[in-house]
Amino acid sequence: MWRGDESPFEGRNFQLPRPLNSPNAVQKPHPPILIGGGGEKKTLRLVAKYADACNLFDVPGVPLEQGIAHKLRVLRSHCEAEGRDYAEIEKAVTSFFQLGPDREAGLRNLVDHLRDLAAVGIDHAIVSPRGPYDDATLEALVSVLPELHAIETRTGSAAAAQ
């Protein structure tokens, strides 16, 4: 499909009489494959085998060492089992946050957390405020963008700059 081949596909779950991808993919040999999730037995094994990138979920209240850092160790072990270079997989995380009544303290905590994520090997972070989505929260995020870009510069990771 990504090569412009429209030959029929007959699979166990899907039958495609004329698979068509229009417009054709720009990236060669195919678009980057990102697999999201943190299942340790299947999902991270599939990441190690097939993906160009993964997106993990930063579960609120789970310490970094038991959460994201642990998932990255599991991914590394799957890469070793597959004979895959762990470093060639981009690691992303989706992190939900709430600034709380003390916005300044909430911002400090968020910046520190993103710095910690970069330090354990996260390349990209998607930060999502928990509702309500208001202009003040978004403006507060904008106010720390220079600091987040500085994390990227120091670590080589874009974890905090997304």
Model regions: which residues?
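Active-site-adjacent structural elements that line small-molecule/cofactor binding pockets in enzymes
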Residues: M1-Q162
